[in-house]
Amino acid sequence: MMIAVTKRTIPVIPLRGLVVFPYMMLHFDVGRQISLKALEEAMNSDQQVLLLAQKDPKQEEPSPEDLYQYGTVAKIKQMLKLPSETSRILVEGLSRAKVIGYVSVDPYFLVEVEEYKEKGGNLDDPELEALIRNVVSAFEEYARLTSRIPPDAILSVTTIQNPGQLADVIAANVIVKLEDKQLLLEQVDLKERLTKLYELILREKEIIEIERKITIKVKKQIDKMQKEYYLREQLKAIQSELGEKDSLFSEAQEYREQVQKLGLSNENLQKVYKEIDRLEKLPPNSPEIGVIRTYLEWIIDLPWNVKSEEKIDINVVKNVLDEDHYGLTKVKERILEYIAVRKLKNNLKGPILCLVGPPGVGKTSIAKSIARALNRNYVRISLGGLRDEAEIRGHRKTYVGAMPGRIIYALRQAKTKNPLILLDEIDKMSQDFRGDPASALLEVLDSEQNYAFRDHYVEIPFDLSEVMFIATANTLETIPRPLLDRLEVIEITGYTEEEKVEIAKRYLFPKQIEQNGLKKSQIRYDEAVIRDIISFYTRESGVRNLEREIARLCRRVAKEILEENKKMVRITTRNLEKYLGVRKYRRDELIEEDRIGIVTGLAWTPFGGETLSVEALVMPGSGKLELTGQLGDVMKESAKAAVSIIRARAKELGIDENFYKEYDIHIHVPEGAIPKDGPSAGVTMATAMVSALSKKPVRHDVAMTGEITLSGRVLPIGGVKEKILAAKRVGIKNVILPYENKKDVDELEDYVKKDMNFVFVKAIDEVFKIAIKE
C-alpha cells in the first residue's frame, strides 16, 4: 500500500460521540459557533474540513487538548441552513490526517496537518491477502448474527477492491465504541489496521453471541413464568373448590385486622381496603406485591391515634428547662406560657416556633430539652441543602422506589402523633427544577391547614395539628416571606461574657471533665481562667468553640497526669498558654486619654459587640473626603452625610465655614483587613470630624452609636445589648445612645446596666456637647 504524505492547513469541526472514516458518506447537524465559523471558512475555500472527535462528548467548548490528534479530511457535499441557527451538512470522508500544530484557535480551530492519501495496495502480498480474507469472513459471520448491518453495506463489501477502503467501511459498520473507532482511524499502516479490525470484529461477534444466549435464557424464564402462572391459577381454583386459603389470602386478612385497629375514618379505611383487595388478586410472582406490601406497612406503622401523655405541670417543666440550659429566657417563657394555656384549654394546637440566632447559642439543644420537659417524643429533620419538594411531601406511588416525605418519616420514627419535630436549618433550603420545599412546608406549618396534611405517597390525610414544630435558623433573610409569616420568631442573641462564664462553670467544664476520664479533684481552675479562655481563645456569640477549648484543656491535663504521674493539675491565667497555646485574639483596649479626632464607637458583629476606634485627620487641600479601613457603602454614605451636617452647622460649631474647600478630611477605622458596614457609625464619624476641624479633644471615657440624618436627627440602631457589653468590657461607663433605643435598654438584665451611665439623644448637637471638650 502506497501512502502519500502532504502537509496543509485546514479548519476543524469538532465532533461529539462520532468518528468519521475515509470513504464514509453521512450527514450531521452543526450548531456551535466554533464549528459554524470553520464551516463558513471551508465553504469559502476548497469545501474541505478536518473532522476531529472529542475525547469527552459532554464538553461544550472544547480546547485543543480535548480533541484527538487523528481525524478525517472530509469534503462538504451539501449544506442546508436550519431555522434554529444550525446547519445540516452532508460530508464524504477523503483521507486520514494527523494534527501537527494549531495555527489559531479563535474564532475557529485552524490546524496544520499531515494528510495520508492511500494509493492502491499490493494484492500479491500473501499476508495482506490473508488478513483481508479473515476480516471479510469475520464480517460476514457477524452480519449473519445481527440485524444491525444494512443489506447494502453487506453487498458493497463484496465489491470493494481497495483494501484500505474495505477496512474503513467494515469498521464504520461493525465497531460500536468510539474509542475503538478512533484507534482504527489512527492506524495508518494497512496491515496493522486490518489486524486490529479483525480482533475487534471477533470481540463484537462474541458479544453478539452472549446477547443471544441471554435472550434465549430470558425467553425460557418468561415461558416458565407463564406456565407457573397457569398452574397456580389452576391450584387456586382447586383450593377454592376445597375451601382452602392460599398465603396471599391469609396475608390480606392479617392486613385487614391490623388496619381495622388504626381508628381511621370510614372513607380512609375503604382506600386502604382497596389496596389490600389488589394484593389479594395479584399473581404470586407479580412485582407489584412488594410495592403494595411496603405501602400497607407504612400505613400500619404510622401513629394515627397514638399520643404521649404531655406534662402540664408548669413548675416541673421550668425546672427541667433550667436544669439543661442557662439563660434563653424568651424561649423558656414562651414554653411556660404554652403550658399555662394548655392547662386551661385541652384542645390547644401545638405552637410553631422559629428560634433565630448565631451558631452555638443552643437552638437545637433547647428544642431537645423542651421535648424532654413536655414528655414529647423528639425527632430532628435536617433541612440544610434541601432542594426537592418531594422530600417534604413524598413521591407518588406510581414512581419506582417511591417513599413518603420527611414529615411522615419523622412521625413513624416518633411513634406518636404529638411529638416535637425540630426543623433544623430552615433558612438553608434552596429550590431547583424539582420544586420549592419551602412552599411545601407552608401547608405543614399552617395551623389552619395541617390538620389534614396529605403526603403524596400515603394519600391519606394525617393530622399534624398536635405536633409541636420548632424551626431553627441563623438568619431570617433567606426564609421566604410566606413561610416566615407562619412562624412565631424568637430571636436568641449571643451570650454575654457573664452568661458564658456561668455556662462554662455549670455545664461545659463538668461535661468535658467526665468525657475525658478525669475526676473533679484532678483539675483545679477559677473564674479568671474561664474569662481568659472566653476573651483570648474564642470570639463567638455561642459557646461551641468555648466547649472545644475546654475539651482541649481537659485532654492536655489528662495527658500531663499520665505522663508525669500527677494527682492534680492547677490551671491559672499564667499557665493557660501552656495548655491552649498562644492567644488567638487580643482584648479591645480603652483609649487612655482625650485625643483630637479619635472617637470610640460601638459596633455589632456576629460574634458579639465590639468597640470601634474612628480616627479623623484634617489637612490643607481641596475638600476631598478620604475613607479607609475597608468601609462599606452605607458607612461611606454616613460619612458624606456627616460632612453636610457639619457644613450646615459650621458657624455654631466654631469651624471655618470654607473647610470643605480648603481642607481634606481623612477618616480611618483601624483593623483595615476586616470589612465594616452599617449606619450606626454615623454619630461617631461626625464627632471625629468636628473634633479634628475644631481642634478640640473628645472624651476618652465616652462611647457612642447611632445613625444620623441630614437634619441632624439621631435614629435608633440594633444590637444594643452587645454594644453596651463591648463598652463595659473595655471599661467605658458612659454610652451615648439614640433616644428611641431607651426601651431596649430598659429590657436589659440588671447586671448589664450595673455601673453604666446611658445618655439618650435625639439630635447630633447633643452628642457634640457631651463628647467634645471645650
UniProtKB/Swiss-Prot annotation:
PROSITE patterns cross-referenced by the UniProt entry: LON_N, LON_PROTEOLYTIC, LON_SER
Conditions for induction: By heat shock.
HAMAP family: lon_bact (MF_01973)
GO BP term, pick one: protein quality control for misfolded or incompletely synthesized proteins
The protein's name: Lon protease
GO molecular function, a single term: serine-type endopeptidase activity
Gene, per the UniProt record: lon
Lon N-terminal domain segment(s): 10-205
Pfam families listed in its UniProt record: AAA (PF00004), Lon_C (PF05362), Lon_lid (PF22667), LON_substr_bdg (PF02190)
Domain Lon proteolytic: 593-774
Highest rank taxon of the organism: Bacteria
Subunit comment: Homohexamer. Organized in a ring with a central cavity.
ATP-binding listed as a keyword: yes
Known function: ATP-dependent serine protease that mediates the selective degradation of mutant and abnormal proteins as well as certain short-lived regulatory proteins. Required for cellular homeostasis and for survival from DNA damage and developmental changes induced by stress. Degrades polypeptides processively to yield small peptide fragments that are 5 to 10 amino acids long. Binds to DNA in a double-stranded, site-specific manner.
Catalysed reaction equations from the record: Hydrolysis of proteins in presence of ATP
Catalytic-site annotation from UniProt: 680, 723
Binding site for ATP: 357-364
Compartments where located: Cytoplasm
Keywords of the record: ATP-binding, Cytoplasm, Hydrolase, Nucleotide-binding, Protease, Serine protease, Stress response
Sequence similarity: Belongs to the peptidase S16 family.
EC number(s) stated in the UniProt entry for this protein: 3.4.21.53
Native species: Caldicellulosiruptor saccharolyticus (strain ATCC 43494 / DSM 8903 / Tp8T 6331)
Gene Ontology cellular component list: cytoplasm
